[in-house]
Amino acid sequence: LVPLTIEEAYELIEAILRGEDAEIVEELGDVLLHVFFYARMGEEEGRFSIDTVVERLNQKLIARHPHVYGQAQASDAKAVLAQWEKLKAAQSERSVIGGLPERLPPLLKAYRLQEKAAAVGFDWASLQGLTEKLKEELAELQRAIEANQLSEAAAELGDVLFVLVNLGRHLGIDPERALHQTNQKFEKRFQYIEKRLKEAQKTFAECDLEELDAYWQQSKSLYP
């Protein structure tokens, strides 16, 4: 059932990114069905029930939202998140950045690691420092490439990606959504090239890069 649950979760994410309410409703229902499946399986095995799940959720929400259910103060969403992460760390005795699923997509995991660290004050003070760090990492990547040190280049590329995710977080840009939009744009532009080649009864192998680039430039005006 787990692979199907992962599939349903991704289908929900895609529906959310497309902004299609009817799809979102349907996919939320599918995910909810899986929640009930697991709860039912737990009940049949005498381990837990849906009531246990809901009760634990209630306890966690109350414990980690003292600004709502207690006397604590939180002025904005950032303060709420910081409070949440501190309480999680205190209650679980885990690392502040612990608790993230091992199978979480790397881009999302990078974002959440940085978000958790920032919640306890370990963060860049300004965008300027972050952009300077990006320049530094790009220079290190360039040196590794020029030296033909592929393993070092791989490590430096990872550093660049990590900084880019952090930059997106500071700008309030979801890197997953940003990359998703760029992927969609590339797909549309590339499919335009395929369409033009089909109309001309030609293949990619029969075209030089200059001709393909001309089609690409045309596609950019259609799909900016």
Each language-model region and where it sits:
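Flexible "arm" and connector segments at domain edges
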Residues: 1-27, 33-157, 161-224
